């Protein structure tokens, strides 16, 4: 086999042999709005394995211990949707913006998600009669 044929064969195998995994989502940020102080808030991110191979999530990291995450521990088939559930423990008053990094075989860089809102002492309801 000539060098030209060998290079062509190797190039064809590297391009067509493996379709990269990819994670996609409609929303990378969920705004929780007002959250009552000391009342945890939970949000679900709906994601999709939009690659051609099974997706394996190796790790999910948060930027602080006040946020917990639940995610699939098994391989996610190509084209399948899956959920990443996050819970923020609202123990501090004020605005929050928590980052969640999803590490997988979809690439070297994590997919970043964020959960934001504002922790308040009580939620004001503006319904009722006005003078």
Task: Briefly describe each language-model feature range.
Residues 1-7:
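Bacterial N-terminal signal peptides that target proteins for export
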Residues 8-16:
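Bacterial N-terminal signal peptides
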Residues 19-40, 44-46, 52, 107-131:
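Long, low-complexity ectodomains and other extracytoplasmic segments of secretory-pathway proteins
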Residues 32-33, 71-76, 88:
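Beta-strand-rich interaction surfaces with strong enrichment in secreted/lumenal proteins
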Residues 37, 78, 92-93:
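Surface-exposed loops/turns
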Residues 49, 88-90, 104:
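Non-cytosolic beta-sheet module surface loops
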Residues 52-81:
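Surface-exposed binding patches on compact interaction domains or structured appendages
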Residues 82-88, 96-101:
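Ligand-binding face of N-terminal immunoglobulin V-set domains in extracellular IgSF glycoproteins
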